[in-house]
Regions:
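Structural/interface elements that position substrates and couple domains in central-metabolism enzymes
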Residues: 1-60, 72-89, 93-122
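Cofactor-cradling patches in redox/metallo enzymes
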Residues: 64-70
Length: 122
């Protein structure tokens, strides 16, 4: 079994066709601890979608599912979580933020989290 890594999915949606929704379900299937943060409250399986900037401890990975134009509102929040890495899923790549993360010693990853999970590279 892979090491458990608490992952915060940023941009989580209760809509089952959204990739953020699929990501939360996939993390749960892979026995990973997940925190879903989105713009609207809701549920993904049994996981509650939190809103705003909830204080969460021991976050290993932040997986981003929001476009770069909306990410600026979350810069300070993501830094406050002190993750080891931030995954920029397709359509979310933000070179400016990736550079800032790297300077802070946080690994920016430009990959699809779903593929990483399925390939055992998570």
């Amino acid at each position: 079994m892979a090491e458990r890594k608490k992952t915060l999915v940023l941009g989580a949606s209760p809509n089952p066709v959204r990739f953020s929704h699929k990501a939360v379900k996939s993390l749960l299937r892979h026995d990973q601890e997940v925190v879903a943060v989105g713009f609207r409250e809701g549920l993904i399986v049994e996981e509650e979608i939190l809103t705003g900037h909830p204080p969460i401890e021991d976050v290993h990975t932040v997986s981003i599912y929001i476009g770069s134009s909306r990410q600026t509102d979350y810069y300070d929040y993501i830094f406050s979580l002190k993750p080891e890495r931030v995954i920029f899923n397709p359509g979310t790549v933000n070179p400016e933020f990736m550079g800032r993360l790297k300077q802070a010693g946080i690994e920016p990853v430009s990959e699809c989290m779903l593929v990483m999970l399925n390939d055992g590279e998570y």
